[in-house]
């Protein structure tokens, strides 16, 4: 009789092509997602050796990191390096015959939003991309993680990847979330508890009632930030919500193929009695709306807290806290809700989906951004943008004083025109608050979409629960 297995064990076992004596495995890769930044050298390597892409039908490319989010980008990109990389992806997609969504295509967007949206991401698959936040696709019960440029070339050429198996970690969120608390608060709270190295060497399976109650968009938010907790990947077992989301997508199975796939997908769960190497349990009702105060995703506190002092920490974290406070321009004991905000960014592969825009618009409806506030919404794909316009969300953002942009990675990272100026402080729905991440000497506070919208209205970090159901301003 086979020993009980975790979800990770099952997907791994189904994809091992060969295993060496030292445990190193050759894994088959079902989907390879490609963008303009980490792929040029890989494609050039194929050209130099006369190789083709092994499985072009399983390779999907989209420009997202470097592309401007303003009109006219399909004809002109001002930054030379960005233009060269986007043009290279255009050429490589054409030359090697892979699936491609150029900036002129309404389906273009952030690769981790486009993949699920188009039905490329399916339960039980192995998914890789030359990008840290590939774990997003784990929300579907897929084994998904980032790879380096040399590995991108290896997958393009062979549709396989050399790997050693990680350990199993379970993160269980019991009970239900309270009003105003979101998937973003879950994932930040987990990282705040375990630290950015807590998941190192592990693949995390997220489970528990609070996870099951999340939408697919929420589950993608949770898995998206698994890497920020040090994990190789994050997984959530597929269920009826997963199947309903996938059904009818352009590249999802149809007819008899759907029924066969569904039968397999229903086996993708952790067996009773399966062993995890590490277990973390958090009560959902104990999670509050949170915000980061420092320069690491683990620097997270409830919005009702105060800025910590270096002396609140031990070991090497004392100096790290001192450096973070200096960089962020904060004072120990200062209320988080007293921190003034210059800019609000709603978007990214963490929170750029339609549900995220709905949550922010609900807070903003009938209100205006604070005087002097720079605020932008960047939908995660052209299709998300179109749906938001159809639902009237775009007009809510525009009426409130937000910029309504085209799809792309935008201000998540300083690789395109959407950047912070030195000293500028941003409430951001993205995933990293490192020094300079959003622009040289820019200051980033990671929050949920609702929290970002609340900060835009008040001009400072704000508990979104204070604005929920608040009356709109008179016209």
Curated annotation (Swiss-Prot):
Amino acids binding [4Fe-4S] cluster: 349, 409, 412
A GO biological process held by the record: L-leucine biosynthetic process
Keyword terms: 4Fe-4S, Amino-acid biosynthesis, Branched-chain amino acid biosynthesis, Iron, Iron-sulfur, Leucine biosynthesis, Lyase, Metal-binding
Pathway: Amino-acid biosynthesis; L-leucine biosynthesis; L-leucine from 3-methyl-2-oxobutanoate: step 2/4
GO MF term list: 3-isopropylmalate dehydratase activity; 4 iron, 4 sulfur cluster binding; metal ion binding
Co-factor: note: Binds 1 [4Fe-4S] cluster per subunit.
Catalytic reactions of this protein: (2R,3S)-3-isopropylmalate = (2S)-2-isopropylmalate
Pfam family, one: Aconitase
Transferase in keyword set: no
Essential cofactor(s): [4Fe-4S] cluster
EC number of the protein: 4.2.1.33
Keyword flag Lyase: yes
Protein origin, superkingdom: Bacteria
Subunit field text: Heterodimer of LeuC and LeuD.
Similarity-based family: Belongs to the aconitase/IPM isomerase family. LeuC type 1 subfamily.
Known role: Catalyzes the isomerization between 2-isopropylmalate and 3-isopropylmalate, via the formation of 2-isopropylmaleate.
Protein name as annotated: 3-isopropylmalate dehydratase large subunit
Species of provenance: Cereibacter sphaeroides (strain ATCC 17029 / ATH 2.4.9)
Lineage: Bacteria, Pseudomonadati, Pseudomonadota, Alphaproteobacteria, Rhodobacterales
Gene that encodes the chain: leuC
């Amino acid at each position: 009789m086979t020993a009980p297995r975790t979800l990770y064990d099952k997907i791994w076992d189904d994809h091992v092509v060969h295993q060496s004596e030292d445990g190193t495995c050759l894994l088959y890769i079902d989907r390879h997602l490609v963008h303009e930044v980490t792929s040029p050298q890989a494609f050039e390597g194929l050209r130099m050796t006369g190789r083709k892409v092994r499985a072009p039908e399983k390779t999907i490319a989209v420009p997202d990191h470097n592309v401007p989010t303003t009109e006219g980008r399909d004809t002109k990109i001002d930054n030379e390096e960005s233009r060269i990389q986007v043009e290279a992806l255009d050429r490589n997609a054409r030359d090697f015959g892979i699936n491609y969504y150029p900036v002129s295509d309404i389906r273009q967007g952030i690769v981790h939003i486009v993949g699920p949206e188009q039905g490329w991401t399916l339960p039980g698959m192995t998914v890789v991309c030359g990008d840290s936040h590939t774990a997003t696709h784990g929300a579907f019960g897929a084994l998904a993680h980032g790879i380096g440029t040399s590995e991108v070339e290896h997958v393009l050429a062979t549709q396989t990847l050399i790997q050693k198996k990680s350990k199993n970690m379970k993160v269980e969120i019991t009970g239900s979330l309270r009003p105003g608390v979101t998937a973003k608060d879950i994932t930040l709270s987990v990282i705040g508890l375990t630290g950015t190295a807590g998941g190192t060497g592990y693949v995390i399976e997220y489970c528990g009632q609070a996870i099951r109650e999340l939408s697919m968009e929420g589950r993608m938010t949770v898995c998206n930030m698994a890497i920020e907790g040090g994990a190789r990947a994050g997984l959530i077992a597929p269920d009826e919500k997963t199947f309903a989301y996938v059904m009818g997508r352009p590249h999802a199975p149809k007819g008899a193929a759907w029924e066969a796939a569904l039968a397999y997908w229903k086996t993708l769960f952790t067996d009773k009695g399966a062993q995890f190497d590490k277990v973390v349990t958090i009560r959902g009702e104990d999670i509050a709306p949170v915000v980061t105060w420092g320069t690491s995703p683990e620097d997270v506190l409830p919005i009702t807290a105060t800025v910590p002092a270096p002396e609140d920490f031990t070991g090497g974290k004392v100096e790290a806290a001192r450096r973070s406070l200096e960089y962020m321009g904060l004072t120990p004991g200062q209320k988080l809700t007293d921190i003034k905000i210059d800019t609000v960014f709603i978007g990214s592969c963490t929170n750029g989906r339609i549900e995220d825009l709905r949550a922010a618009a609900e807070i903003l409806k009938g209100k205006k951004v604070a005087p002097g506030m720079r605020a932008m919404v960047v939908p995660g794909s052209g299709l998300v943008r179109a749906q938001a316009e159809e639902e009237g969300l775009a007009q809510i953002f525009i009426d409130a004083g937000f910029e309504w942009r085209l799809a792309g990675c935008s201000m998540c990272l300083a690789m395109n025109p959407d950047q912070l100026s030195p000293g500028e402080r941003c409430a951001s729905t993205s995933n990293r608050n490192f020094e300079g991440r959003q622009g040289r000497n820019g200051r980033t506070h990671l929050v949920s979409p609702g929290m970002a919208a609340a900060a835009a209205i008040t001009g400072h970090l704000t508990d979104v629960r204070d604005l929920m159901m608040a009356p709109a301003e008179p016209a």
